[in-house]
């Protein structure tokens, strides 16, 4: 078995290299002697004495004694864990174990002796020493001791450090013994010659640094392995954890390998014993400061996020309280200042955004989310937002990271998606907790306050021109783009329901005060008093807050009363009455506490309403007022054409326009932003001018501006808004807004260019108009034309009122009447019909239950057709051929007697082949002839479900048979043409029957020769048409 892939051999008595090393890995503790002697040393000493006394006999017995000693040593090692208490580990073999390639495999296979050896505290301490080695932690040392490369030799770098070391080692060894040196040189020379013959590349010996790095990696793999005994042994010895966590005390930057080892080991311990690990982590001093020293290290910051994720609402661990007491959020915001490097700023910003995502308020996010907490509440507090805004105004990377944090806060803490809306809660029904959803009132108010500063930064930022293939352009820059993105997101935030509720701000402040008091009393032992005092400093007007609290408490008590009290006594009902009495005043005051929206056809956008909203603005309106005062929205809109190639900016501008045109019109300040967009900014004129500029530019250069796609989207928003106000019959008090829609140039643009563009956008990809029609349309149209064509030879056509029905047979509505089932005639006899209006017409395949009254007419044709149809079925059961010329002699009379308006070549549910010769030819036949395939008695399909494929001899698919005449409105109309309905039906049927006879006879003559040639193939072949099983017959 020399070529077998099994590398362990077939002899089970052969030990693995790891097991051989482990045989000498335990030293027995001898209490009688002062010195500890490894197992087997006594026997070796005795043997040595005997060898010294009798040299002649020793030469022949050395090998036998050594083998016996190894077996005895193996047998003397204990087999239970308790017996190893009398042994201590031999640390000299640890390096040999780490150098073995199969060590980790043996560990995963639960090698008993290996587990016992690795569980010793001395061994674990040595492994941690490998991981925390200064050579591993010191990145400069690693880089300084790298092999030198001779400059100027690019193709073949020469390694000179190893050569020098080899020379030194050879020189030192050369002074010991010449014979040993010569032998070793000779052996090494032979080995090198063999290696050179086998391969052209020889691996140099590992350096000391490489060996230590490899051993540190293996040690980290062992410590982080999914082996419970090792993890438990580490957790039992806190000193080992302390030495491991000393990595955080190393000055920055910390090498990535060392931080990776730290993260892997601690994550394993955290998963194994979360309680003990968190107890150790929270007991560490300056936890936040030690982690923020390495804020640039992603592995350490990811581990900190995992520690934070353990503090869930249903099982709190106290991590968030400890981190808040150590001021994690303020220190992270400090790292966003330009005083730190760009990488440090970006790392701090990324950590804050990841933490906000982890603390999302949405229940549809990842299961690992911890929900709102005190850290995120501190982040959106007035003090922290003010600090963040000042950092953002410094520009550069600070602005970019700050905008990213604000956007993440708004998107992950939308109050509209709260499980319980804040305005519907009370202190009694929902006492405030540290896990309450956070609100963004302070955020919106402070950004409205500093909006002029951001507007100045947007206007003053200028960048040098850039050379492009089509000319020099001015780049937008990250600062201006981030400001535009910030404005769009703040506009989203200002439309939240909580920020537009009159009592929303008061309720939020009341709950914040109550929550701060509870935290202050419950966390005195945890030194949270200072932070609570800082939080309480946000509210300066204590008297006003007490009055608000008392008033809201009375209002909430009244809300908890009976329904009669709610309707008569509460302040909300009184506000609703005020809304009905004075619509204009309430509309200006945002309908006070009720939020009732009045559906008035006139939109109040007068100056009096504007001033009324400015006197007592809500939080959401305060931001919109700041946007209007700074004219920042108009400045952003002008940038649409100034930067025609920046699609990111165009997308943001479209987002702003979409919010304005879809915002509330009857409440809030949004109507005035709309007026500024249409009247002051003259948006319609800008769109038309931009489209014309693009056309002129295209004529000169052959290129179109990059904003045309978003320009069309903005124009579509204006058109939809115009349709909305027309449909709702809304009018503006100020007619300037309505006049913009009635200007000639805008009407011409919307009716021509915009309409054509809309039609192109709405076209299905790959649709070529009316050039191609679907198969169903072709069949339906051909059927309708043939049916109308049949009426041309009908003598009853043109007699009067029923001509319109026949002439309009191609119309879709009349065709539906033609194909649908009619219940107007013989309702008592139509229960037995199983008829469908589409292709799967059951009467086409076979008659489930035929109505006897339809076949008992005086002419007798229906009954004869049924009898012939039954004969065809019986022939199929006897295994006749698929095509029979004898049956075709009377085929025309048999097939056309069922109805007069269903010619076989125009049957509505199945189209005929274009070549008449293919109609009676079975193209689905086997290449070889099979005997007995037509005999039903030879084979019975056990899986036949009644829908199996048809077999040869089935007459249903040689020539399509028409079902009995359906009861439709068309037939009823034809019957009403004459008082004698039966005679007219016979006459009409005869005219069409003659036509069918001629067509079928012509098809038979054309295909007669071809059928004779393929008679054998058709007789023995299979058809892919579906039919009922023979049990149905």
From Swiss-Prot:
The modification Phosphothreonine is found at residue 990. Residues 909-924 have a biased composition (Polar residues). The modification Phosphoserine is found at residues 774, 857, 862, 892, 991. Residues 158-170, 183-195, 858-879 have a biased composition (Basic and acidic residues). Residues 32-82, 147-213, 768-813, 828-1033 are annotated as: Disordered. InterPro entries: SAPS. Associates with the SIT4 protein phosphatase catalytic subunit in a cell-cycle-dependent manner. This is SIT4-associating protein SAP190. It comes from Saccharomyces cerevisiae (strain Lalvin EC1118 / Prise de mousse). The gene is SAP190.
């Amino acid at each position: 078995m020399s070529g077998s892939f099994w590398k362990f051999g077939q002899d089970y008595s052969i030990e693995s290299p790891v097991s051989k090393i482990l045989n000498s890995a335990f030293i027995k503790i001898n209490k009688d002697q002062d010195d500890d002697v490894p197992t087997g040393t006594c026997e070796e000493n005795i043997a040595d004495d005997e060898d010294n006394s009798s040299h002649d006999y020793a030469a022949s017995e050395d090998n036998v004694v050594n083998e016996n000693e190894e077996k005895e040593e193996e047998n003397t090692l204990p087999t239970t864990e308790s017996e190893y208490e009398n042994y201590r580990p031999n640390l000299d073999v640890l390096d040999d174990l780490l150098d073995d390639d199969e060590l980790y495999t043996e560990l995963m296979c639960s090698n008993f002796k290996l587990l016992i050896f690795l569980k010793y505290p001395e061994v674990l301490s040595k492994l941690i020493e490998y991981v925390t080695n200064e050579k591993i932690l010191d990145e400069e040392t690693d880089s300084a001791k790298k092999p030198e490369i001779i400059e100027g030799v690019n193709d073949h770098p020469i390694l000179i450090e190893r050569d020098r070391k080899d020379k030194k080692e050879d020189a030192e060894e050369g002074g010991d013994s010449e014979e040993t040196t010569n032998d070793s040189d000779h052996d090494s020379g032979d080995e090198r010659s063999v290696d050179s013959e086998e391969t052209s590349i020889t691996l140099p010996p590992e350096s000391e640094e490489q060996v230590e790095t490899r051993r540190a990696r293996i040690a980290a793999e062992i410590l982080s392995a999914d082996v419970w005994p090792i993890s438990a042994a580490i957790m039992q010895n806190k000193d080992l954890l302390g030495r491991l966590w000393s990595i955080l005390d190393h000055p920055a930057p910390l090498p990535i390998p060392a931080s990776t080892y730290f993260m892997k080991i601690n994550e394993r311990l955290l998963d194994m014993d979360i309680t003990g690990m968190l107890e150790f982590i929270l007991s560490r001093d300056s936890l936040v400061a030690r982690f923020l020293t390495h804020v640039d290290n992603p592995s350490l910051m990811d581990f900190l996020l995992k520690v934070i994720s353990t503090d869930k609402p249903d099982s709190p661990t106290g991590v968030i309280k400890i981190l808040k007491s150590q001021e994690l959020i303020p220190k992270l915001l400090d790292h966003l200042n330009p005083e730190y490097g760009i990488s440090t700023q970006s790392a701090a910003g990324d950590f804050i955004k990841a933490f906000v995502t982890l603390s999302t308020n949405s229940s549809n996010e990842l299961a690992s989310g911890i929900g709102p907490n005190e850290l995120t509440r501190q982040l959106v507090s007035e003090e922290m937002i003010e600090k963040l805004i000042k950092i953002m105004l410094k520009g550069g990377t600070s602005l970019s990271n700050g905008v990213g944090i604000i956007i993440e806060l708004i998107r992950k803490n939308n109050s509209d998606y709260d499980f319980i809306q804040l305005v519907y809660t009370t202190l009694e029904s929902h006492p405030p907790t540290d896990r309450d959803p956070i609100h963004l009132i302070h955020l919106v108010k402070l950004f409205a306050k500093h909006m002029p500063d951001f507007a100045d930064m947007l206007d003053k930022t200028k960048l040098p021109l850039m050379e492009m293939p089509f000319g020099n352009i001015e780049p937008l820059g990250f600062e201006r783009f981030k400001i535009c993105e910030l404005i769009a997101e703040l506009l989203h935030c200002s439309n939240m329901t909580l920020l537009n509720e009159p009592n929303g701000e008061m309720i939020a402040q009341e709950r914040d005060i109550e929550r701060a008091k509870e935290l202050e009393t419950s966390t005195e032992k945890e030194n949270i008093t200072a932070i609570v005092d800082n939080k309480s400093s946000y509210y300066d007007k204590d008297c006003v807050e007490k009055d608000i609290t008392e008033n809201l408490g009375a209002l909430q008590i009244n809300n908890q009363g009976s329904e009669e009290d709610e309707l008569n006594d509460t302040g909300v009902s009184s506000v609703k009455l005020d809304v009905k009495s004075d619509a204009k005043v309430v509309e200006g005051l945002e309908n006070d506490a009720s939020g009732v929206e009045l559906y008035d056809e006139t939109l109040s956008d007068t100056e009096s309403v504007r001033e009324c909203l400015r006197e007592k603005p809500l939080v959401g309106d305060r931001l919109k007022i700041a946007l209007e005062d700074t004219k920042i929205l108009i400045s952003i809109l002008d940038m649409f054409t100034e930067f025609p190639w920046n699609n990111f900016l165009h997308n943001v501008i479209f987002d702003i326009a979409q919010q304005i045109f879809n915002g509330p019109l009857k409440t809030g300040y949004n109507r005035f932003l709309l007026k500024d967009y249409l009247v002051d900014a003259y948006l319609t004129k800008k769109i038309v001018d931009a489209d014309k500029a693009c056309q002129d530019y295209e004529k000169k250069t052959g290129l179109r501006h990059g904003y045309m796609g978003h320009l069309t989207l903005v124009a579509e928003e204006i058109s939809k808004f115009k349709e909305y106000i027309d449909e709702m019959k809304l009018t503006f008090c100020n007619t300037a807004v309505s006049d913009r829609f009635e200007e000639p140039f805008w009407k011409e643009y919307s009716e021509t260019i915009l309409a054509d563009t809309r039609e192109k956008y709405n076209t299905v990809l790959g649709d070529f108009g009316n050039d191609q029609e679907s198969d169903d349309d072709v069949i339906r149209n051909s059927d309708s034309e043939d049916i109308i064509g049949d009426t041309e030879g009908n003598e009853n056509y043109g007699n009067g009122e029923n001509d319109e029905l026949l002439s309009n047979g191609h119309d879709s509505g009349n065709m539906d009447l033609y194909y649908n089932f009619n219940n107007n005639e013989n309702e008592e006899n139509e229960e037995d019909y199983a008829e469908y209006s589409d292709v799967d017409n059951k009467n086409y395949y076979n008659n489930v239950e035929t109505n006897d009254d339809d076949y008992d007419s005086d002419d007798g044709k229906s009954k004869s057709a049924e009898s012939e149809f039954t004969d065809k079925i019986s022939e199929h059961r006897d295994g006749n051929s698929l095509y029979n010329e004898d049956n075709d002699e009377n085929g025309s009379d048999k097939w056309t007697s069922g109805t007069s308006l269903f010619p076989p070549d125009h049957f509505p549910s199945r189209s005929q082949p274009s070549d008449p010769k293919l109609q009676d030819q079975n193209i689905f036949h086997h290449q070889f002839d099979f005997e007995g395939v037509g005999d039903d008695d030879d084979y019975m399909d056990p899986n036949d479900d009644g829908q199996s494929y048809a077999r040869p001899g089935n007459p249903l698919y040689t020539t399509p048979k028409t079902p009995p005449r359906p009861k439709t409105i068309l037939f009823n109309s034809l019957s009403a043409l004459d008082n004698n309905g039966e005679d007219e039906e016979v006459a009409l049927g005869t005219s069409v029957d003659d036509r069918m006879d001629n067509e079928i006879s012509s098809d038979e003559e054309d295909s007669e020769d071809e059928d004779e040639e393929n008679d054998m193939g058709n007789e023995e072949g299979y058809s892919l048409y579906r039919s009922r099983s023979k049990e149905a017959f």
